[in-house]
Amino acid sequence: MSKVIEINHPLILHKLAILRDEKTGSKDFRKLVEEISMLMAYEVTRDLNTEEVEVKTPVAVTKCKMLSGKKMAVVPILRAGLGMVDGVLNLIPAAKVGHIGLYRDEKTLQPVEYFCKMPQDIAERDIIVVDPMLATGGSAIDALTMLKNRGAKNLKLMCLVGAPEGIEAIKKAHDDVDIYLASIDEKLNEHGYIVPGLGDAGDRLFGTK
């Protein structure tokens, strides 16, 4: 059963408040998304495996812990997910980066993949899928399905803000994927926007409309 983890660290809450403000421009918005993503990644990676190693310091030989087990990958959902990548890489610089681009066919409402580029060994990696907004959950569900179809098994979803509707949709479709959020917001409005949300994260990141 998937877990839903709301990371309410004071630094995240402070930065998220500035991020939400409609007066925050694209330059500051990008920086805040990166900073919050790095802080969240600390919690998302809390359960990574470690092994004991011997290290010689300038003073003595000692036992230390280092990461062991699977390599990692971060996979942004285009385009807004790109804003979260550097924050994760600041903490996990050795992680590989894959990209997933999706849109929905207006007639069939089915997901259409327009771009997908993954590390060759993606099936063997622990994967963090990143997207600032978890609204209906449709894009995240499709992205997780695509990764599973490529053999991925250990997946986590990291979003800045999410609506209860999207969270429930993910839990129903992918009950083996844990969901990490900086905030669980109130609801979706009639246009499918998260309330209070951030507005359109992609437009605010890249200065487009």
From Swiss-Prot:
Entry's cofactor comment: Binds 1 Mg(2+) ion per subunit. The magnesium is bound as Mg-PRPP.
InterPro entries registered for this protein in UniProt: PRibTrfase_dom, PRTase-like, Upp_B, UPRTase/APRTase, Ura_phspho_trans
An annotated Gene Ontology molecular function: magnesium ion binding
Keyword Membrane appears in the UniProt entry: no
Signal peptide as annotated in the record: none
Regulation of this protein's activity per its record: Allosterically activated by GTP.
EC number(s) per entry: 2.4.2.9
Pathway assigned in UniProt: Pyrimidine metabolism; UMP biosynthesis via salvage pathway; UMP from uracil: step 1/1
UniProt keyword annotations, A-Z: Allosteric enzyme, Glycosyltransferase, GTP-binding, Magnesium, Nucleotide-binding, Transferase
Gene3D superfamilies, per database record: 3.40.50.2020
Catalysed reactions, as listed in the record: UMP + diphosphate = 5-phospho-alpha-D-ribose 1-diphosphate + uracil
Residue numbers binding uracil: 194, 199-201
Entry keyword Nucleotide-binding: yes
Any one of the GO BP annotations: uracil salvage
Cofactor: Mg(2+)
Family in the record: Belongs to the UPRTase family.
Role: Catalyzes the conversion of uracil and 5-phospho-alpha-D-ribose 1-diphosphate (PRPP) to UMP and diphosphate.
Name the record gives this protein: Uracil phosphoribosyltransferase
Name of the coding gene: upp
